[in-house]
Amino acid sequence: MTSERLYVWAWLPGASTPIVCGVVEERRGHHRFNYGRSYLENPDAVPLYGIPLQQGAAPLPNGLTLHGTLRDALPDAWGQHVILQRLTGRSGTSGDPAELSMMTYMRESSSDRFGALDFQESPTVYVDRSDSASLADLDEAAERLQRGDPLPRTLEAAFAHGTSIGGARPKATLTEGSLHWIAKFSSPAMRHEALALFLARRMGIDTVDFKLTGVRGRDVLLVRRFDRAEGGLRFMTVSGLTMLNLDEMFGRYATYPDLLDVLTSQGNDPARIGRDLFRRIAANIVLGNSDDHARNHAALWDGRHLRLSPAFDIDPCRSPGWDSNQAMAYGREGQRASTLKGLIRCAPTYRLSVTEATDIVDQCVAAVEDNWASALEHARLTASQAGALRNIILNKGIHDHRYAPRNG
């Protein structure tokens, strides 16, 4: 029987190779983590986020069965289904990922995972579980997996590229020369995301780099990885859920004000984080992205400070009507309605006056209105697709803030 113990390896800041930093063991559904002695004695060691550098089992935050910084390195729905299909032989994505343990996902997922951690069977020998694959192979593997078709041996390497990253839709990691990408495969949502990223950048949002490309007669969205430097250097990275000591079960309790508090107290630039976060919320509302849950926010961790990552996974998915809510509340009293007027009323939370907040919102709305045609062209959207998005983004509801009093 395979031991329910795995060793955690980490890439320290600036390091090109990993070192063992600790061990994780599963006992009755709870995962205990201990730093290794060699890591604690290493003068260059940095703490994993949320786990102080000290001997003994690190206590789990209330309600959690696995430290968030370790959970962030595991696959989400798509990657779990890929692993489930490989291990069980069942086709399609109808299986229940809960059939397999977190330890299994640690062991079976690719080493090219989110952030700068990996899981290994050995504390002394590191075995890289990531192979190269072409974009065409990745696309074909994703298509076959969605259909439930068996994969030929020639696509087995491509298969693994979908096992190490988060998200529910088909995607895979890709390396092109010295650059590292996440490939998102052909679907309407992929083009919608390209349009939203294009517009968000013109709103003044720091977004991930991205490009639309073609393979096998289909479009693929390539999103530049912010947890990798050019050449492959890895950055420790944590999700919003981890920053808030939450997991998926309790993710509904995540709020922007709580995230703001963490980034203010632990961030590298506390003076401007309120303004930056407010602009991102405004952009999400304008762009119809109501899927702004805590795992769709991240920060880079250097052992001392957090730095908000570029914005990613911006998806215009809100229904075109008025009654919509953001996944995370933006007000300290639970306000989450997808209206700009409601957001502006919460300006003091982000250390902004009403006038400053309204100016930011106006800039976001103007960016959409001024760049709509070029965004459609950039995202290669058809007339019918553009019409549907127009009802979501250029919706009368996004102008409601213009009737709010500017008295701040």
PLM region spans:
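Phosphate/dinucleotide-binding and metal-coordinating scaffold of catalytic cores
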Residues: 1-294, 298-408
